[in-house]
């Protein structure tokens, strides 16, 4: 198989679809380089003294791991100076990060979850980085949080990296989903999967079943029907998989089908969900839809949601289309 690098792939996609201008290509390449650096830091583990808590909390009130902080800094520093961005926003930061005046400004906005699944860091389970790219509004001079308040349909690129047995980068620019594997010897992203498609039907689901007693009736009904197996109304047996790392769970679903669920529940009935719309749900929904799947919050298509605040949370149901459609229909009854 001919080896195609990330750069070559992006250039060829631009020639085919005319959707990846040079500034966007360069931005994606910079994010890719930052993910290589994060992969290197993750790979050192205890030898690099990067495990354990940083002794601080992020804007969500969550205790930060050392690698959360390191990964956030890597992404900020890598993307500040290139001239492709007007501003960045991170799950780990309270407000947006404007590009310093000493650097040229670009026309894109970058959002990221620098290290998703960080509760798994110390036990050596796959974790990852999620990112989303928006076009800055026309006529914008000094970026504000309001400039980021764009629905997911406005994303021009989205992707994630998984730091597991192999380090992979999954990317969409609106023309399918492609996967690159990091060649550690060459230090290069190499195209290893083109036009990934999620099977419409599945026998696997991912949900944190320890919260079952808190679920609302539509989720309870849906999961109970799957657990009833071949003797129940679904007429087939299902397996449950739960890694507690969204990138790892979604990557499995992308490759062999399944449904990922992180619903709202009765513990905080006034909160619409746990996952962040801008940093997690939107980029993953873009990727999943581009792979032929579906993504909703139980009632609405995630990509249609109009954000109201930077750290807005949503419920998430995504993956194989027929399963997402079914659980969504239960919420709408």
From Swiss-Prot:
Q: Where in the cell is it found?
A: Cytoplasm
- Residues reported in the UniProt entry to bind Mg(2+) 1: 91, 113, 115
Alphabetized GO MF terms: fructose 1,6-bisphosphate 1-phosphatase activity; magnesium ion binding
Cofactor binding annotation: Binds 2 magnesium ions per subunit.
Organism superkingdom: Bacteria
Question: Where, by residue number, does substrate bind?
Answer: 116-119, 208, 274
* GO BP annotations listed: fructose 1,6-bisphosphate metabolic process; fructose 6-phosphate metabolic process; fructose metabolic process; gluconeogenesis; sucrose biosynthetic process
Q: Which reaction does it catalyse?
A: beta-D-fructose 1,6-bisphosphate + H2O = beta-D-fructose 6-phosphate + phosphate
Which positions bind Mg(2+) 2? 113, 116, 280
User: What's a single GO CC term here?
Assistant: cytosol
The entry's family comment says: Belongs to the FBPase class 1 family.
HAMAP family, alphabetized: FBPase_class1
Please identify the protein, giving its name as recorded.
Answer: Fructose-1,6-bisphosphatase class 1
Source species: Herbaspirillum seropedicae
